[in-house]
Amino acid sequence: RPCLLDVTLYPYSRAEANAWMIFPYEIVNGARTTARLIQPAEMAQRFPLCLAYLTARRAELERRNIVGGSAATRQFYQFGRSQSLTKFNSPKIILPILSREARYAYDDNNIMMTGGGNGPYYLIRPREGAPETNFFLMAVLHHPLSEAIVRTHTSSFRGGYYSHGKQFIEHLPIPSATPAERADIEALVAQLIAANDAAQAARVPHQRILHERHAAALRDQVEGRVSRLFGLSAADIALAKAVPIPA
């Protein structure tokens, strides 16, 4: 499966995998979505080279502390923890736990990554049945008010980095919005991500500058829409932006 390995994520960007991860599971959709560990006999038939690769590293893999799975199905190559394996298979927001600004990227390609503790990555997606979408949440999370709240409560690290871990973002306020207001913001965020994609792909400096200007204008529009939902004035926004990076 495609995965992230020490990749820098950018605001309103699309996450791009730079490596591959062996995922020895099959996602089974039923009344409850589960991740079924592929057993050795099946792996030998379907993915013989993968099994050979894992077997060559068996001694190293067996030194890990394995949690999860029944005794009958547990294998030396299963992941150390398995409680979130099914959550990768859906559109989601990916963020670096440690950063010096809001950096929430979008993924709709089922990218894998490691996480937990101080990262390096964390995933967000709307609760099932919630009216908010990933794009709407990205707009709120990137807003200066949200980042000001994070900076006020976060843990700081060397180099000016501070945590955007679960405990610092899970209680951020989400403004009420009508379906039309949410749709408007979602459309702008989709355009903003596309503009950043175009800027990243541009090979001619002039084209890149044009796309970057377009992205900046779209970001201002998104910020303005969310500010209105929060009922914030220009002075309120200036105050939020003035909150310093924690020392």
Residue ranges and their predicted role:
Residues 1-187:
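Polybasic, glycine- and aromatic-enriched phosphate-binding surface used to engage nucleic acids
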Residues 49, 175-247:
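Non-catalytic DNA-recognition/assembly elements of restriction-modification systems
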